[in-house]
Amino acid sequence: MKDPRHDDQREIRAPRGSELNAKSWLTEAPLRMLMNNLDPEVAEHPKSLVVYGGIGRAARDWECFDKIVEVLKRLEDDETLLVQSGKPVGVFKTHADAPRVLIANSNLVPHWANWEHFNELDKKGLMMYGQMTAGSWIYIGSQGIVQGTYETFVSVAKQHFNGEAHGRWILTGGLGGMGGAQPLAATMAGFCMLAVDCDPSRIEFRLRTRYLDKQAKDLDDALAMIENAKKTGEAISIGLLGNAADVYAELVKRGVTPDVVTDQTSAHDPLNGYLPQGWTMEHAAEMRLKDPAAVVKAAKQSMAVQVQAMLALQEAGAATLDYGNNIRQMALEEGVKNAFDFPGFVPAYIRPLFCEGVGPFRWAALSGDPEDIYKTDAKVKELIPDNPHLHNWLDMARERISFQGLPARICWVGLKDRARLGLAFNEMVRNGELKAPVVIGRDHLDSGSVASPNRETESMMDGSDAVSDWPLLNAMLNVAGGATWVSLHHGGGVGMGFSQHSGVVIVCDGSEAADQRIARVLRNDPGTGVMRHADAGYDIARNCAKENGLDLPMLKD
């Protein structure tokens, strides 16, 4: 039987330029960003609607994709399209300041929120895994995670190596849509990196897009290349074809200790995202259909081997961190009782940024013209003149990051700056500096938009790790504020049962009405992050709330 989610004939690319295909830019924007998610330059497996992260899809099947496109082209500016796990289920009359699209992906009642139940529904065509930005139509390729990874690695260097990364190297696994950002982020931060992946096409793609510098013939070759780079002080990234569990265990056996150890394989999804040791990709694909339970068991056993190796490398002196793929949880379930002895990256390195509402602010040029991004880069520098670290990031991004699909930029800024930047971009559209509108969004991995006890909300100081009211409040506030589209997802990053999170996108179309919406949404959205962390007792967040005039009734002076 033909899989309705796969079509070899499809090649999707977002329209460029200033000509509308829909009735306004408020509906043209989600149309273009949906299509951009499936651009072959952007998506991991576009012919199967898979954007990134195992099976993170943009639409449930091709019939649903076609219908979403059809509806967006006819949608009026006082109507809202509802999308249920990648399927367009209704159009309702709302008003001009309401979102044009509301999306709910992969949400299950908690008792049933596990991969087994999800996979049953997925097989029946009743659900879709939206990951974070796959099903919410704001994925911009690996750049979307580069700066966050860069910030993490810079923080690692500060905490462990007195700020000096040169002559140090990082071991990691996974070069998919998220993991593929690691080699570039590492070399930008001054580290060398050895990145292991079992899929040769992923290594080739990262080499082609300049995220990865070189490919090694084997582990001996890779280690020799790293030793040479350490001597010369060069920061290089090396891809190695292999199974991460095998390579990590072999390094332990050899007594070779990297300076830093992490992992970004798709361990969150043991059925579709992680290749068991000793298996070929072809055998795994066959077994997923024949005996999915055996695949899950074998994958989790291999993850346990990898985590045991990570713990051994930590014991030998490596700075070891979980990069948010839930591999520790999978190993724990396989009997590795001390799997959580190494920390997640958010509590270890990122949380102080979240306390000030700083997170992965991103925008894309609907014109398709890179010059629009370069002009907005300059505007960011103009409006935030006293942040050399941010300026350095923008300079490196322009020099070293290849655009995938529509030109876009990621730039970590917080409560103080997001609305100012959004209003400035809207003014640039209004006065013709930009050739077409821009969309502003973010990852769901942000300060106020996610509950994920094994990642973003791990080890909250008040113990509120699993409280998921916060992303629900964030989504509702963004709807009330007039965002262009808002999404509520479950299971992104760490898999079914382990996270709830929300996304937001707003269009800068140059109108005065957009000014009002932008001012509300881009203050409120990061404001909920400051609120969430202030409520948990973080002094940085409480001070930020006071400095920025947030009205938090329970916050004591």
From Swiss-Prot:
SUPFAM superfamilies assigned to the protein according to its UniProt record, in alphabetical order: Urocanase
Entry-linked InterPro entries: Urocanase, Urocanase-like, Urocanase_C, Urocanase_central_sf, Urocanase_CS, Urocanase_N, Urocanase_Rossmann-like, Urocanase_sf
Pathway as given in its UniProt record: Amino-acid degradation; L-histidine degradation into L-glutamate; N-formimidoyl-L-glutamate from L-histidine: step 2/3
Native organism taxonomy: Bacteria, Pseudomonadati, Pseudomonadota, Gammaproteobacteria, Oceanospirillales
GO molecular function per UniProt: urocanate hydratase activity
PROSITE patterns cross-referenced by the UniProt entry: UROCANASE
Name of the protein this chain belongs to: Urocanate hydratase
Gene Ontology CC: one annotated term: cytoplasm
Gene3D superfamilies per UniProt: Urocanase like domains, Urocanase superfamily
Catalysis performed (reactions): 4-imidazolone-5-propanoate = trans-urocanate + H2O
Compartment(s): Cytoplasm
